[in-house]
């Protein structure tokens, strides 16, 4: 095996870089594309159904399911980014002593995740995530020993599917 063999295995182009991406959730505004620090492309799973016949089992395709999606967001001093998620979550299920909640058409939104080539302009992969809403707006860590770092928080979102 030679180094050239490795590079030939990627004839379609260069290696994908995990730090060249943007997340767009239009509901949260244009600034969110710069506030989302980390994420992963969500998993899609096709469950297997074991079917027995005599003493053998075969597996056939079951239903497709989608795991929750997590994003890491850089917080701003005014806490606008986090408050937008809290407000969005409150559309689904109100906060406080009132029992409120909106219809799915009111709180389910879409997102686009784009991964870029090394020129940071060419989109190499784009997926649209449908039926999103925040199930968990994560905690904000406060620590006197946290110097020279930006405060971040995680948000977990339920989703219907991605394409």
Curated annotation (Swiss-Prot):
It comes from the Viruses. GO terms for cellular component: virus tail, tube. Its main location: virion. It is found in: Virion. InterPro entries: Phage_T4_Gp19. GO terms for biological process: symbiont genome ejection through host cell envelope, contractile tail mechanism. Pfam families: Phage_T4_gp19. The keyword Protein biosynthesis does not apply. GO terms for molecular function: structural molecule activity. Keywords: Late protein, Viral contractile tail ejection system, Viral genome ejection through host cell envelope, Viral penetration into host cytoplasm, Viral tail protein, Viral tail tube protein, Virion, Virus entry into host cell. Belongs to the T4-like viruses Gp19 protein family. Forms the central cylindrical rigid tube, which is surrounded by the outer contractile sheath assembled from gp18 subunits. The tail tube first 2 annuli are formed by gp48 and gp54, which are in continuation of the spike complex. During infection, contraction of the sheath drives the central tube through the host outer membrane, creating a channel for DNA ejection from the capsid into the host cell. Homohexamer. The tube is composed of gp19 hexameric rings. Interacts with gp54. This is Tail tube protein gp19. It comes from Enterobacteria phage T4 (Bacteriophage T4). The lineage of its organism: Viruses, Duplodnaviria, Heunggongvirae, Uroviricota, Caudoviricetes. The gene is 19.
């Amino acid at each position: 095996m030679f180094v050239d063999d490795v590079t030939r295995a990627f004839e379609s182009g260069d290696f994908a870089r995990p730090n060249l991406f943007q997340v767009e959730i239009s509901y949260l505004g244009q600034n969110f594309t710069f506030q989302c620090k980390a994420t992963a492309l969500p998993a899609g799973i096709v469950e297997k159904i074991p079917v027995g016949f005599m003493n053998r089992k075969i597996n056939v395709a079951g239903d497709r399911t989608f795991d929750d999606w997590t994003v890491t967001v850089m917080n701003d001093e005014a806490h606008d980014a986090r408050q937008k998620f809290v407000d969005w979550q409150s559309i689904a299920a109100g906060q406080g002593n009132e029992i409120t909640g909106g219809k799915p058409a009111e709180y389910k939104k879409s997102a686009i995740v784009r991964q870029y080539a090394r020129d940071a302009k060419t989109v190499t992969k784009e997926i649209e995530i449908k039926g999103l809403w925040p199930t968990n707006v994560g905690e904000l860590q406060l620590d006197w020993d946290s110097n020279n770092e930006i405060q971040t928080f995680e948000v977990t979102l339920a989703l219907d599917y991605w394409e």
